[in-house]
Amino acid sequence: PQEEALSYLDAISSHCDYKKDSKDIVEAAASEYCEKQRKVKAGFDFPSFCYAMATGIGKTRLMGASIYYLYKTKGYKHFFILAPGNTIYEKLRKESNPNHPKYIFKGLEAEMGKPKVYDGENYDTYPIKYDQMSLIVEKTSDIQLFIFNIGKIFNSKTDTQFNFHKFKETLGASFADVLAQFDDLVICMDEAHRYYAPASMKAINYLKPVLGLEFTATPKSTSNVIYAYDLARGAVEGYLK
């Protein structure tokens, strides 16, 4: 199923340029080349595609494969990975370490090198500089992953903004402003149905990614699903017990 899922991203990506094309053009390509031709429409300000995959099929592996694909075919190097809570956040942090047995890019090390990982604990060490008060983000040859836990950085009861939208003295800017500088930022949302509250969507839209990839077994809406693989099919085909 992961290979099949990736084939739809490939078909869509081959017919549009996420950096240059408008959201409407990208969604028109997605509507034509998704699994079951349908009108694809994302709720965010940017094009965002959902993989509706049953739990246990390997969404994290698919995320790693999608990142590799966009790096290899489009040259994108900046990937923002959002986790819905501490358990998944810690799991993603561990699995982004090449020494972990379930390394997210297992088997792709020779092609990808070692991606630099920034997360909720070390993001204020990100290297930036200023030129006449303008924020300059250094060009990088490495893939950079930014792994954040929405529960940790955003508290809807007390906070109207993500913590990384706040000014950081060490950076001289907010980390959201740093992320918004990248012209190739892709946002990967694990358990994507958790991010559709208005405040979360506003904070995510602020980052201006070129593309969103959503991974969930229970999509908030089916309007942007490009590939679906449910429990029943997984059981029949032997991927789930």
What are these model-derived regions, one by one?
Residues 1-241:
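RecA-like P-loop NTPase motor core of helicase/translocase proteins
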